[in-house]
Amino acid sequence: MAKEFGRPQRVAQEMQKEIAIILQREIKDPRLGMMTTVSGVEMSRDLAYAKVFVTFLNDQDEAAVKNGIKALQEASGFIRSLLGKAMRLRIVPELTFFYDNSLVEGMRMSNLVTNVVKHDEERRVNPDDSKED
């Protein structure tokens, strides 16, 4: 029987917290003027690589998102060194940053469902109006 919550998942969870603190307190890059949230971290089994998924507060502007990811990639060495000081790991993983659009996509889907439910309620209240269309 395999472990359901192994070491890579535990390290990823702790790393997510530490990276969020580092981004909030230590990174002073003007390209990251918008609020950055670490939504998840995926670790490789050997703990040598980490995919860091981030979201931005003003993520409607695609150019700002690309600049934010680029700034994080360029600061990954600095973030990695601070991470090494904060966590006791034999190998500090190589960090790769990705934009996590699942939150935006989830909000879009929620809005679609809300609109469909509202439209359905309107049709139930006024059944004659829908037949005239």
Curated annotation (Swiss-Prot):
InterPro entries: KH_dom-like_a/b (IPR015946), RbfA (IPR000238), RbfA_dom_sf (IPR023799), Ribosome-bd_factorA_CS (IPR020053). PANTHER family: RIBOSOME-BINDING FACTOR A, CHLOROPLASTIC-RELATED. One of several proteins that assist in the late maturation steps of the functional core of the 30S ribosomal subunit. Associates with free 30S ribosomal subunits (but not with 30S subunits that are part of 70S ribosomes or polysomes). Required for efficient processing of 16S rRNA. May interact with the 5'-terminal helix region of 16S rRNA. One of its GO terms (cellular component) is cytosol. Pfam families: RBFA. This is Ribosome-binding factor A. It is found in: Cytoplasm. Keywords: Cytoplasm, Ribosome biogenesis. Monomer. Binds 30S ribosomal subunits, but not 50S ribosomal subunits or 70S ribosomes. The keyword tRNA processing does not apply. Belongs to the RbfA family. The keyword Cytoplasm applies. It comes from Salmonella newport (strain SL254). GO terms for molecular function: ribosomal small subunit binding. GO terms for biological process: maturation of SSU-rRNA.
